[in-house]
Amino acid sequence: MSQQQFKYIVRLFGQDVDGTMKLPYALAMIKGIGYNTAMIIIRKLNLDKDKRLGEISDEDIKKIENLLNNKIIPESPNWIYNRQKDYESGADMHLVTSDLIFYVRNDIERERRSRSWRGVRHSLGLKVRGQRTRTTGRTGATIGVRRAKAGQPQQQAKPAGPAEGGEAKK
């Protein structure tokens, strides 16, 4: 393949992806697609996993986009989908980029409105999945330790008198 045909930047799902990366890793750069999902997509479309993203044709890029624009990956296991049993439709879907962000934001907002435990934790900005919060996840300014000024000597303790339980004069 000549140098003119190699694309160093490839536009994929409205996002610029480095064309020098191998195909599975380049697809994994897109939000909503991980390495395993990328490998399933590559197998479905009979692409070479060792090729660079900049080496594949524009038709193959369109095939990849069309496969995920349908929000389903045909003949793939249910565990590969990143949105299983959708709240409104009940279908398994695989969302990418802004669709994924939109659905997750709507889920969080629905839980806040219903005042479920998860919604309350989200609205308070706390951890949701049962993690400990005593020491980790702290936000806000830290309060340091106050130190005495270096030039001032510390006050010496006075010897206790008779009223304070000290020795009486004779």
Curated annotation (Swiss-Prot):
Q: Which GO terms describe its biological process?
A: translation
HAMAP family the UniProt entry points to: Ribosomal_uS13 (MF_01315)
What assembly does the database describe for this protein? Part of the 30S ribosomal subunit. Forms a loose heterodimer with protein S19. Forms two bridges to the 50S subunit in the 70S ribosome.
- Source organism per entry reads Sulfolobus acidocaldarius (strain ATCC 33909 / DSM 639 / JCM 8929 / NBRC 15157 / NCIMB 11770)
Q: Which PROSITE patterns match?
A: RIBOSOMAL_S13_1 (PS00646), RIBOSOMAL_S13_2 (PS50159)
This protein's UniProt keywords: Ribonucleoprotein, Ribosomal protein, RNA-binding, rRNA-binding
Q: Which GO terms describe its cellular component?
A: cytosol; small ribosomal subunit
Q: What is the lineage of its organism?
A: Archaea, Thermoproteota, Thermoprotei, Sulfolobales, Sulfolobaceae
Q: Keyword check for Kinase, yes or no.
A: no
Region described as Disordered: 132-170
- What's a Gene Ontology MF term here? rRNA binding
Low complexity biased stretches: 133-162
Function summary: Located at the top of the head of the 30S subunit, it contacts several helices of the 16S rRNA. In the 70S ribosome it contacts the 23S rRNA (bridge B1a) and protein L5 of the 50S subunit (bridge B1b), connecting the 2 subunits; these bridges are implicated in subunit movement.
What family does the database annotate?
Belongs to the universal ribosomal protein uS13 family.
Query: Pfam families under this entry?
Result: Ribosomal_S13
User: Where on the tree of life does the source sit, at the highest rank?
Assistant: Archaea
- Name of the protein in its database record: Small ribosomal subunit protein uS13
